């Protein structure tokens, strides 16, 4: 459950480290696979994404439990997102950590192919 003012880790190598959600698109609460508008709160130096930059991101992990249709529930240790461009492609070239299978259903195939593990 991601809402405005929620801090998220960045799960790619785009240069940002922490994001703060400022808007969830088309919903009140964001879940895995939802696109958010966020502001970069921490960033690495000498990288293309700078601190205080407003970016679009897709949620890939949430600490809130997800109940799947087959009865299985899944929960991650942190809230994480991958920064994307207007077309929905990731701005980084690598994705760190596991991601949920729900991204495949939402047509974020490029992120799924970059991920080391899909749960």
From Swiss-Prot:
Keywords: Chloroplast, Plastid, Ribonucleoprotein, Ribosomal protein, RNA-binding, rRNA-binding. It holds the Pfam family Ribosomal_L14. One of its GO terms (cellular component) is cytosolic large ribosomal subunit. It is found in: Plastid, Chloroplast. GO terms for biological process: translation. GO terms for molecular function: large ribosomal subunit rRNA binding; structural constituent of ribosome. Its main location: plastid. Belongs to the universal ribosomal protein uL14 family. Part of the 50S ribosomal subunit. Binds to 23S rRNA. This is Large ribosomal subunit protein uL14c. It comes from Ostreococcus tauri. The lineage of its organism: Eukaryota, Viridiplantae, Chlorophyta, Mamiellophyceae, Mamiellales.
